[in-house]
A protein has these predicted regions:
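ATP-dependent carboxylate/acyl-activation modules
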Residues: 1, 145-147, 153-162, 166
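Catalytic cores of soluble metabolic enzymes centered on carboxylation/carboxyl-transfer
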Residues: 1-121
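Short, solvent-exposed coil/turn linker segments
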Residues: 18, 27, 123-125, 135, ...
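Alpha-helix capping and helix-coil boundary motifs
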Residues: 44-47, 129, 155
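A generic structural signal for well-ordered coil/turn residues at beta-strand boundaries
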Residues: 82-84, 131, 155, 164
């Protein structure tokens, strides 16, 4: 896990994915040619931005499951966990975007769920410990490693998800 004010992971991811870099057609002037005005991580979108939303919903559902199992809750006011959620993401220009999400077939012990985002289905499983920043798991049979941080900004319930150099 790389932490700090910022990191160069998005830049490295963009560099390694650039077609000229992939084919080996680069030289010492490559960065000056392609990033003369600087680099902005927002210019390199995630291959599947809905995966980030699905992972956020999956992790939120896991936190809600833990909260619902805490003993000593006030009778009649226990934490109830549904399947429908709205994930609010912050666009690169600061605007909020909302996504309707369904998290079903939740299995807390196995750490798996089916997540629907915008008509796409994601079968996510992970046994990562809540509060752990590095989360490993699988999505639709493919392994992933992501950074998941809870309590970012002024919202203690907010999640920051970073995967493959984007968030």
């Amino acid at each position: 896990v790389i932490r700090g004010i910022s990191s160069n992971i998005p830049f490295q991811a963009a560099l390694l994915a650039h077609p000229r870099f992939v084919t080996g057609e680069f030289n010492t002037g490559f960065i000056a040619e392609h990033y003369a005005k600087g680099f902005s991580a927002e210019d390199v979108p995630h291959d599947d931005p809905d995966f980030l939303v699905a992972l956020a919903a999956f992790m939120h559902r896991r936190y809600r499951a833990r909260a619902s199992g805490i003993s000593g809750q006030l009778a009649g006011h226990e934490v109830k966990v549904g399947e429908q959620f709205v994930v609010v993401t912050l666009g690169h220009e600061g605007q909020n975007q909302q996504a309707q999400v369904t998290v079903s077939d939740f299995e807390g012990k196995s750490g798996s769920s089916a997540v629907m985002v915008g008509g796409k289905s994601y079968q996510i499983s992970s046994n990562a410990t809540l509060g752990q920043i590095r989360v490993q798991g699988s999505c639709n049979g493919q392994g992933f490693t992501a950074q998941v941080e809870r309590g970012v900004g002024k919202n203690p319930l907010a999640l920051r998800i970073a995967h493959n150099g984007t968030q």
